[in-house]
Amino acid sequence: MTTDFTPWPEALAAQYRQLGYWQDKTLLDYLQQSAERTPNALALVGDNQQWRYQAMLERIEQLAAGFTELGLGCGDNVVLQLGNVAEFYLCFFALLRQGIRPILALPAHRLAEIRYFCQHSQAKAYLIDGAQRPFDYQALAQELLACCPTLQTVIVRGQTRVTDPKFIELASCYSASSCQANADPNQIAFFQLSGGTTGTPKLIPRTHNDYAYSVTASVEICRFDQHTRYLCVLPAAHNFPLSSPGALGVFWAGGCVVLSQDASPQHAFKLIEQHKITVTALVPPLALLWMDHAEKSTYDLSSLHFVQVGGAKFSEAAARRLPKALGCQLQQVFGMAEGLVNYTRLDDSAELIATTQGRPISAHDQLLVVDEQGQPVASGEEGYLLTQGPYTIRGYYRADQHNQRAFNAQGFYITGDKVKLSSEGYVIVTGRAKDQINRGGEKIAAEEVENQLLHHPAVHDAALIAISDEYLGERSCAVIVLKPEQSVNTIQLKRFLHQAGLADYKIPDQIQFIDQLPKTSVGKIDKNALRRRFDTLGLALMS
């Protein structure tokens, strides 16, 4: 029997409650507390909408009643794929209120990923944006209905263009009926998505208790309060802008979230000046772009207190440059959707902020740095990071075999990150052990792309490697061996991957053709040799 959810051991759960980490409240309870304190305070701005706390809460309750009337109930799974719009949070909280579990798909996900989420979770509904651009999600939903038998309803923000009665408009879901909240703080609240190293992203089950602790502790560390004005330019469904402290942290503190569907500095700087933004979260490529643009920008960015950078390693040189370029403090963030989050603290020295990725949220976060044999390394030595704690999951959803590889016998999560741990407990990220490309914060599993390439009739063998990129940190390069007397070009291969339903960010940035892939002494593809051959920028930086 497949395990849906791996709970924390009872002794640990009891300890976390005794310490006050787990409050046995739902995520909606924290929003309700803010609505009670400051009902008329501005909570959310975006897409020509403004929501004050009490009005937002009432709208969430109306949606919750409407979702219940659709036949969705506690324990049902729903794929939620909305961008940076107010309805993302309204739907998120409404589903949580009823114990309905949203899978937080990203706007960039396409057929291959969404089909897997629906089939693996037996999702009953798919919630999407009705706009045709930049992507037609309604057309995707029609494909899903043909291959996902549990999918009963497609809920569309905006207008439906499909006559199928399974398509309904979100606007019709608001109900004046009352319904009893049905969420359990100890059970799965929603699903985040893993970066993945073995194909399609795994589902990460987060409970109300563990996630709420992560957010509330982050609020304290980052000193969010009712005066916080947070600009969300990264995809709202990402763990980083959702909970570190992210939008949820702003709601908990009684501040205001300003949404932007455009992350460009030209647009974002205008919003910073207009709304007196105090904090935002960026991935390294975006931070570099903003820094470059700030040098010639005339917008007033003086309201910024600090900018968070995470999702991928931020170079020391860039970290030292940011405070002067943007006129505010840098906070480095190193975290994962599976749990563990590290922050540099706001009162840390400039040297610590520039040279480390922070230290953990909790005194009860356990970090182990081990060698290839699983033995602890000396302080300051490089090794592989393992972790467990009050907000780090104990297993992926319905993934027993993968869990045996991803967690050790003591329940520690094997992160796949190579790090050093300082004597003060600060983490310095040095690399990755997993076969994964971190493209500007978007994680790409090499195996997933390789498997799709191998389905092409002209491809004999394929390897996907990471190569250095000045802005993205890493980009992807597919190295292809063709079958005898077969031919295919780069454009045709990329089109093939698009047609297979891969997300755009997974399409290789570069494709190289060679006669034979190099092998190690045990017959595995030697990706280090491929990187040495094709990563010209990385070699230049090392020389």
UniProtKB/Swiss-Prot annotation:
CDD domains: 23DHB-AMP_lg (cd05920). It is found in: Cell inner membrane. GO terms for molecular function: 2,3-dihydroxybenzoate--[aryl-carrier protein] ligase. Belongs to the ATP-dependent AMP-binding enzyme family. The chain crosses the membrane at residues 240-259. GO terms for biological process: siderophore biosynthetic process; vibriobactin biosynthetic process. It is a single-pass membrane protein. Activation of the carboxylate group of 2,3-dihydroxy-benzoate (DHB), via ATP-dependent PPi exchange reactions, to the acyladenylate, preparing that molecule for the final stages of vibriobactin synthesis. Coiled coil: none annotated. One of its GO terms (cellular component) is plasma membrane. SUPFAM superfamilies: Acetyl-CoA synthetase-like. Pfam families: AMP-binding, AMP-binding_C. The lineage of its organism: Bacteria, Pseudomonadati, Pseudomonadota, Gammaproteobacteria, Vibrionales. This is Vibriobactin-specific 2,3-dihydroxybenzoate-AMP ligase. Pathway: Siderophore biosynthesis; vibriobactin biosynthesis. Its EC number is 6.2.1.71. Keywords: Cell inner membrane, Cell membrane, Ligase, Membrane, Transmembrane, Transmembrane helix.
